[in-house]
Amino acid sequence: MTEVKTGRVVDDAPVNDAPENNAAEATSPARHDAIPEEARQRAAQLRADLERHNRLYYELDTPEISDAEYDALYRELVGLETRWPALRDEASPTQRVGGEVLEGLEKQAHTLRMYSLDNAFSRDEWGAFIQRMYNALPDAPSAFWCDPKMDGLALEVIYENGVFTSALTRGNGEVGEVVTAAMRTVRNLPLALRGDDVPRRIEVRGEVVIAKADFEQLNARQSAAGGKLFANPRNAAAGSVRQLDTTVTAGRPLQFLAYGVGQVVLEGGTAPWTTHSGLMARLREWGFDTPPEGRLCASPDEVWAYYEALGARRESLAIEIDGVVAKLDDTEAQEALGFTARAPRWALALKFPAMQARTRLDDIRVQVGRTGVLTPVAILEPVRVGGVEVSRATLHNEDEIRAKGLMLGDMVLVQRAGDVIPEVVRPLVEERTGDERPFVFPENCPECDSPVVRPQGEVAHRCVNVMCPAVRRQSIIHFVSKAGLDVRGVGERWVQQLVDGGHVTSPVGLFLLTKLDLMRFERMGPTSAANFVTALDAARTGATLVRLICALGIRHVGEQTARTLAANFTDLDALREADAETLQQLPDIGPEVAGSIRSFFANEGNLELLERLRAIGLWPKRQDAPPASEGADAIVLPLQGLKVLFTGSLTRVGRTEAEDMARAAGANIASSVTKSLDLLVVGGKPGSKLEKARKLGIRVMEEADFFAMLASGVASVDASEAVAEETPPSQEAAGAEDAPSQGAAHVRTASDETGSASGDDSRGAAAENDPARPARGGAMSTAEGEDVPRGRAEQLKLF
């Protein structure tokens, strides 16, 4: 297959999304120092924390920390991985785009990955980015196209022959949620493109936003109707697009602003633009609105001047923005620079400093979490910060209060950076009147009056009473939450009401509730009560070992560690018997985590809870595993230790479910095709990952064969052995013919398509003959030593 770089035919060079091939990063000297255990544990904790906050922000729209706090965690992890490169792995948040796709809406793979952007917060960091760019491409042009960085929901709208056909949220960058019906109601989205020169197929990428004035009116209507108020325009936009009832979406003041394209299929010829500014002009001609204030800057210095000027008047703009996106204007230079594992090397987000406001610190209240940690919360005189009313802010711990020198009654500086939870920056000492009072951290729990302790080496104070009402309440809420057992339809407010009323004293109590029990509560009718009971019963019978371990709330055990434990122990009995030495032999489990697990199982109250869970049938074993041998804690799994990657559109289950099944069989999930990959599982239209795997001689297995292998419990692949049955050469060639290289956006001419078109979304018999799918010559196929045949379709990579 040939690629077109801004109209010139060159040798095919698929996007290489493996981090080790990052040309810009390759200039950094390798570090081989021994990794201290503290650094290893801190990196593991940072990865778990960042993944959790990614999910809260991108998927659930309920962030718990500010952008500035997230950036600080992210940069700390980058620093550790830079200092000790062996800490970096493919699952690190620094190597990925985003988080996982929510259930509830249909999922669909993006034809081409929707990448994230790297960030800069200072002129020095902008200069460092420019230097890296010129190191990688010395003759790179100096002009950049600049847009405001909008604070909305990123998605992709797709047009066939000029007519709107579908829309996908960005999701995790590779798979998004189908929101076609909702986007059809967005008034400024063209349902048909203008002009005669529209592409045969085009994927337009942009942001769904709500203007500030429209947001105020929306919240006023919500308030008048007694509905829930939105925290900010981004949450309102994201929630509106994800509505299953499109009449609700139609009533929301949404706008779609286009900033780029994915795949483009032309009737003939080459792309009608050679610059990003030219692309933006063409998008406007086709009928799209584009971000306001977009501008072509002739040099990096001009970009910085644009950034400063826009930042000075951001409050006067009609939409919420939190920075500037600068993209190298020349598309041929973009193509030459390519991508890292998570972001383009030719674009950068220049973030604005957080928005700030003055207000009074009226009080500091202490809350108790599920692990007994006491967290101080600032109670503020309500103030608007960046268009959102702020009345509370977390202070994290006593040390932060002391370090900032806060006193009750202080005038303080508060900031937020586009998310819900703000930060108290500092007290305005110069405005003190003498009436301010020092805050004294409580010596007793505010919920149960038990003594509070601060363990040596920790910043947190803890309530040591295991029967503390707050600890019990938060533990039960966590047990059924998305971070725990993930019980759909059982809301936090109902659980809190049941616990506070004394009707439920442990997680087990929830599963013993009957429909009649629930109908005694106000606003809990027969249907709601039945749904509540059904949801809990479904969670009880369908729980996986991973989710149960997460639900138990063992300190230092997040979802990734829970997956590791579930992959190595048959059930909680086996895990309970494991000693600290056995646990520390597992990936990412050090002395602290192992000690926490052992402490959990040494607690009599926890053991009693486990027996009660067993009694109600909530006792899952490791998925697809035979019982462990007598006296053995861990078992050998079909895919134990193998690196597995999924690509293409899966038909049996979603990508997340497939990855969970592979993990349960002992596999490690990879994020890209590298030499260390053991197995690539392909669905429909697998694209560039399949082509790259063939070039590297990596084993390839079709979706149906993979699930058949899991069902049998016997692995058909071993990284140390040759493939048992290779596909006959004739079938291999037929299966590989015209497989599209989809590393980034590309343009094809319609006249070059033969057989089953790669743009065809049909299934069934058509999918069987899809030339982008591998042949069915056996359970596995490989093309070691063979070059994948090139098609004649032309490609152009665009952001």
Curated annotation (Swiss-Prot):
Q: Which residues cross the membrane?
A: none
Q: Which organism is it from?
A: Nitratidesulfovibrio vulgaris (strain ATCC 29579 / DSM 644 / CCUG 34227 / NCIMB 8303 / VKM B-1760 / Hildenborough) (Desulfovibrio vulgaris)
Protein name in UniProt: DNA ligase
Ranges annotated as biased composition (Basic and acidic residues): 1-11, 787-799
Example of a GO MF term? DNA ligase (NAD+) activity
Q: Which GO terms describe its cellular component?
A: cytosol
Q: Where is the BRCT domain?
A: 634-723
* Function per UniProt: DNA ligase that catalyzes the formation of phosphodiester linkages between 5'-phosphoryl and 3'-hydroxyl groups in double-stranded DNA using NAD as a coenzyme and as the energy source for the reaction. It is essential for DNA replication and repair of damaged DNA.
- Keywords linked to the UniProt accession: DNA damage, DNA repair, DNA replication, Ligase, Magnesium, Manganese, Metal-binding, NAD, Zinc
* An example Gene Ontology biological process: DNA replication
Establish whether keyword Manganese is in the entry. yes
Q: Which family does it belong to?
A: Belongs to the NAD-dependent DNA ligase family. LigA subfamily.
Q: Where does Zn(2+) bind?
A: C445, C448, C463, C468
Return the Low complexity bias intervals: 755-767
Cofactor(s) this protein requires:
Mg(2+); Mn(2+)
Instruction: Supply the gene name.
Output: ligA
Q: Where is the active site?
A: K149 (n6-amp-lysine intermediate)
Q: Does the record bear DNA damage in its keywords?
A: yes
The UniProt entry, under PROSITE patterns, shows: BRCT, DNA_LIGASE_N2
Q: Which residues bind NAD(+)?
A: D67, A68, E69, Y70, D71, S116, L117, D147, R170, E207, K327, K351
Q: Which reaction does it catalyse?
A: NAD(+) + (deoxyribonucleotide)n-3'-hydroxyl + 5'-phospho-(deoxyribonucleotide)m = (deoxyribonucleotide)n+m + AMP + beta-nicotinamide D-nucleotide
| Domain of life, source organism | Bacteria
Gene3D superfamilies in UniProt:
5' to 3' exonuclease, C-terminal subdomain, 6.20.10.30, BRCT domain, DNA ligase/mRNA capping enzyme, Helix hairpin bin, Nucleic acid-binding proteins
UniProt-annotated stretches for the region Disordered: 1-35, 720-799
